[in-house]
Curated annotation (Swiss-Prot):
One of its GO terms (cellular component) is Golgi apparatus. The gene is erf4. It is a peripheral membrane protein. Disruption phenotype: Abolishes palmitoylation of ras1 during vegetative growth. The keyword Membrane applies. Residues 152-172 are annotated as: Disordered. InterPro entries: Golgin_A_7/ERF4, Ras_palmitoyltransferase. Keywords: Endoplasmic reticulum, Meiosis, Membrane. It comes from Schizosaccharomyces pombe (strain 972 / ATCC 24843) (Fission yeast). It is found in: Endoplasmic reticulum membrane. The erf2-erf4 complex is a palmitoyltransferase with a major role in driving sexual development. Palmitoylates ras1. Palmitoylates isp3. Palmitoylates rho3. It comes from the Eukaryota. This is Ras modification protein erf4. GO terms for biological process: meiotic cell cycle; protein targeting to membrane.
């Protein structure tokens, strides 16, 4: 089953991504309320720090980039990219602890947080076109164009369950 938590624009508008703190009903079997509250509040704070243009790290990163004609980003990397990598690892760790798969927040364009339960009988019809093709056996990451809405979620599957799952706990 796919659980999609869409971005909440009422908190910060479009300055930086934030997600609602509501407890998602489909995840109750996997995550308790306290763990969810800690996760979502920490995630929102990390996203604010990473995307807020007026944070100290982002200001220093921008000034250093301009002064070095953006060479510093290639040599040292940017603080923003490091923070986004840490956020991806934080989400991955949370999903792993609670026996869930998660789509990379970067691949989802920071518009939605998508979890997939590890039930073998529930697959999304949008994640694969032909499960018996050889390419299906080598899929290790979630395609970036996949979205899960109520119109394209399939909770049952007619193909073999011994094929590898197309969702992985990986970040790109």
């Amino acid at each position: 089953m796919l659980v999609r938590i869409e971005r909440d624009y009422s908190v910060s508008g479009d300055k930086y991504p934030q997600f609602p703190t509501d407890y998602p009903v489909p995840l109750r079997a996997y995550v308790n309320l306290e763990d969810w509250d800690v996760f979502i509040h920490t995630l929102n704070e990390k996203l604010r720090e990473a995307f807020c243009p007026w944070s100290i790290g982002n200001l220093l990163d921008g000034i250093l980039s301009v002064l070095t004609i953006y060479i510093s980003e290639f040599v040292f990397g940017s603080i923003h990219r490091k923070r986004i990598g840490a956020i991806d690892l934080y989400i991955l760790d949370f999903a792993t602890q609670h026996n869930l798969y998660v789509a990379s927040l970067r691949n989802m364009g920071f518009l939605s947080l998508v979890f997939h339960t590890k039930e073998t009988n529930s697959k999304s019809s949008t994640l694969h076109s032909n499960p018996y093709c050889p390419e299906h056996h080598s899929i290790r990451t979630l395609p970036s164009a996949v979205t899960a809405t109520t119109s394209n979620i399939s909770t049952s599957s007619s193909h073999r369950s011994d094929l590898p799952n197309e969702w992985t706990n990986s970040t790109l």
